[in-house]
UniProtKB/Swiss-Prot annotation:
Organism from which the protein derives: Buchnera aphidicola subsp. Acyrthosiphon pisum (strain Tuc7)
Chief place of localization: cytoplasm
Bilayer-spanning residue ranges: none
Function comment: Catalyzes the ATP-dependent phosphorylation of N-acetyl-L-glutamate.
Protein name stated in the entry: Acetylglutamate kinase
A GO molecular-function descriptor: ATP binding
Top-rank lineage group of the source organism: Bacteria
Length: 257
């Protein structure tokens, strides 16, 4: 069975209830299945709250956070520090063998600067799977923040959905984009169970898919194209359904090329 990459986002990182549900589902899943699992996360809301406390501006362009050089150390601390180690702490609380990493560790994901106008925002490029495969052999779950490092040693903030796509490509894994959003919704607010690139672009043009969801959907489409398999967008909110999701059942929106 292919490895599984679970991307965490939304309010999950700030909710004890969400953490409890997620890690209970992972523990139960690992009791019955030997599939290798890797977790990757961002922490946009955590960063927004921190920036507001520091009276620093929060600016985005096409759903991507503008990250000037004076902000990258703060964002690195929030993502690779607070967010990553909070997830690691929850894993240890549930006796899960986990290790906290960033994209650069083991050369797992290469990163280049995406756009000078965005500052320290990186483009994730699939790297080497060898380090992560060694961790899998030891029975560990890598928990990876979306902070990367360029070849010339610059810290980069990478959109976590796009980082997850690169990670899934590196591992030839199935990908789940997990957040507080249960699925993509149509113009009437109803769940879309399956969507392809033509349908997605139509909903974007109509203004039904907007803002950060555009990045999420396009990341899922790119992952589906590269991996040649569908990608799931789903919510963490139902523990029982999470177990089904980890085993390949569609509980949200399944994205096809």
């Amino acid at each position: 069975m292919n490895p599984l990459v679970i991307k965490l986002g939304g309010v999950l990182l700030e909710s004890d209830d969400a953490m409890k549900r997620l890690f209970e589902a992972l523990v139960d899943y690992q009791k019955f299945y030997k599939r290798h699992v890797s977790v990757i996360h961002g922490g946009g809301r955590l960063i927004d709250n921190l920036m507001n406390k520091l009276s620093l501006p929060v600016k985005k362009k096409n759903g991507l956070r503008i990250t000037p050089s004076e902000h990258i150390n703060i964002i690195t601390g929030a993502l690779a520090g607070t967010a990553n180690k909070t997830l690691l702490a929850w894993a240890l609380k549930y006796n899960i063998n986990a290790i906290g990493l960033c994209l650069a560790d083991g050369g797992s994901i290469d990163v280049e600067r995406l756009d000078e106008n965005l500052g320290h925002v990186g483009k994730a490029i699939p790297g080497s799977p060898l380090f992560l495969k060694k961790l899998f052999k030891e029975g560990a779950i890598p928990i990876i923040s979306s902070i990367g490092i360029t070849k010339d040693g610059l810290l980069m903030n990478v959109n976590a959905d796009l980082a997850a796509t690169a990670l899934a490509t590196t591992l030839q894994a199935n990908l789940i984009l997990l957040s507080d959003i249960s699925s993509i919704l149509d113009g009437k607010g109803q769940r879309i169970t399956e969507i392809d690139s033509i349908q997605a672009e139509k909903l974007i043009m109509q203004g039904i898919i907007t803002n950060g969801m555009i990045v999420k959907v396009r990341a899922a489409l790119e992952a589906a194209r590269v991996l040649r398999r569908p990608v799931d967008i789903a919510s963490w909110q139902n523990t029982e359904k999470l177990k089904l999701l980890f085993n390949g059942v569609n509980i949200g929106t399944r994205v096809y090329v």
